[in-house]
């Protein structure tokens, strides 16, 4: 089973699917979306990561209890549990690394407004704040201290030119349509609106795709 197989399975909100499968589908979707989007996406607030972390902890304890048992049947079950455990751990690590890479690259940007700070988890916000403070102190001790006071800010916007480096929202992304909809896209020469049906895969600027992804009309792939 590959990523597309997981994403094509039944809707994760369906009550007919076990909660473990729904969480795995949701985590996989978040992982794919975070790696595909050029900017940091909203941190999930539905308790998904708390449930996944609790499940990982339970599975680790189960593996520790089963380790050392020489029964072949138990050993086979142990292999299955370890394989599932590694899948969850890989998705979690890769998802968090993708987010940290974006925070490291555009720290000031994500600290520049409350709306952007709300995208971060409490741990990420603490990390970004401390990271930026350490970086600023390093710059001060290295060279900024020799500059005039008015030139020491790293977020200066004088002359309507911002020093804050921001993500490129016009980066091209691939999206899969989740319902029939007319898709508006910005082009270099002209803008265009095209009809799209459920299941279509499109390449489009993130600035045009973001709203559709946010409201559930499409998903990143």
From Swiss-Prot:
Any one GO CC term of the record: GINS complex
Q: What is its main location?
A: nucleus
Into which family does the record put it? Belongs to the GINS4/SLD5 family.
Question: According to its UniProt record, what is one Pfam family this protein matches?
Answer: SLD5_C
User: Which domain of life does the UniProt lineage start with?
Assistant: Eukaryota
| Biological processes, Gene Ontology terms | chromosome segregation; DNA-templated DNA replication; double-strand break repair via break-induced replication
Functionally, this protein is described as follows:
The GINS complex plays an essential role in the initiation of DNA replication. Has a role in chromosome segregation.
* Taxonomic lineage of the native organism: Eukaryota, Fungi, Dikarya, Ascomycota, Pezizomycotina
> What does the subunit comment say?
Component of the GINS complex which is a heterotetramer of SLD5, PSF1, PSF2 and PSF3.
Which organism is this entry from?
Answer: Gibberella zeae (strain ATCC MYA-4620 / CBS 123657 / FGSC 9075 / NRRL 31084 / PH-1)
The protein, known as = DNA replication complex GINS protein SLD5
């Amino acid at each position: 089973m590959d990523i597309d197989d997981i994403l094509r399975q039944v809707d994760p909100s369906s009550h007919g699917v076990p909660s473990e499968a729904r969480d795995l589908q949701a985590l996989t979707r978040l992982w794919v979306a975070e790696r595909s989007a050029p900017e940091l996406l909203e941190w999930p607030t539905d308790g998904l990561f708390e449930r996944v972390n609790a499940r990982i902890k339970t599975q680790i304890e189960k593996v520790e209890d089963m380790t050392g048992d020489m029964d072949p049947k138990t050993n086979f079950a142990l292999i299955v549990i370890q394989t599932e455990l590694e899948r969850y751990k890989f998705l979690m690590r890769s998802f968090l690394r993708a987010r940290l890479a974006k925070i490291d690259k555009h720290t000031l940007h994500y600290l520049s407004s409350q709306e952007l700070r709300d995208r971060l988890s409490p741990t990420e916000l603490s990390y970004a704040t401390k990271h930026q403070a350490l970086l600023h102190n390093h710059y001060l001790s290295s060279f900024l201290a020799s500059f005039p006071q008015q030139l020491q800010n790293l977020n200066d916007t004088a002359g309507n030119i911002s020093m804050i480096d921001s993500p490129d929202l016009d980066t091209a992304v691939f999206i899969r349509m989740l319902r029939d909809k007319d898709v508006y896209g910005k082009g270099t020469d002209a803008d265009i609106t095209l009809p799209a049906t459920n299941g279509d895969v499109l390449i489009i600027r993130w600035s045009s795709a973001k709203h559709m992804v946010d409201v559930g009309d499409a998903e990143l792939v």
